[in-house]
Amino acid sequence: MSSSNYVYRNNFSDDDDITTAISDYLFWSSLAFSSREVAGNVFLVFESFKKDASLVFGNDLTAFVKNMFLDSKIGFEQSKIMINSMLKKENHIRESCAVIGILARAAEYWGGESSPTCSSMKVLVLLRDLVSDNDISLVKSALIIRLKRLNEKSIHLQV
């Protein structure tokens, strides 16, 4: 199992390391569902980024990630082109979150074992190649805002 710093976390602040949190999430996503640790709210919010991915990359995320062919070098290079071609640079926050969402879906599709596969771990290299420091800052802001909303909903449900 992963010795993740963020898998169990329910909160996230400006002092936390978003790059490590995303890497932990992508690693976790590459595991079979039966091999995943029960995650906290941080990963629950990261899961919501798949909705952003559906809006940016289309409703059939499985078909999209299947065509990434992460099990080949040509497919890996093509993946960068595919993802970049879908980014219109109109809603930077949504598109930044969508890239995380599509990479998580790719990690699931190309992983699914008790430990990450070579193909599923290529999403970490794609993360580095596709997501700028500015994009990472936008993802961090979106995560903090969505966590705040999630926590507010939880408080209202308890009352």
Swiss-Prot record:
Report the Pfam families cross-referenced here.
Poxv_Bcl-2-like
Q: Which domain of life is it from?
A: Viruses
Query: Which Gene3D superfamilies does the record cross-reference, listed alphabetically?
Result: dsDNA poxvirus
Q: Which family does it belong to?
A: Belongs to the poxviridae B14 protein family.
What protein name does the entry list? Protein B14 homolog
Name the species this protein comes from: Sheeppox virus (strain InS-1) (SPPV)
Give the taxonomic lineage as stored in the record: Viruses, Varidnaviria, Bamfordvirae, Nucleocytoviricota, Pokkesviricetes
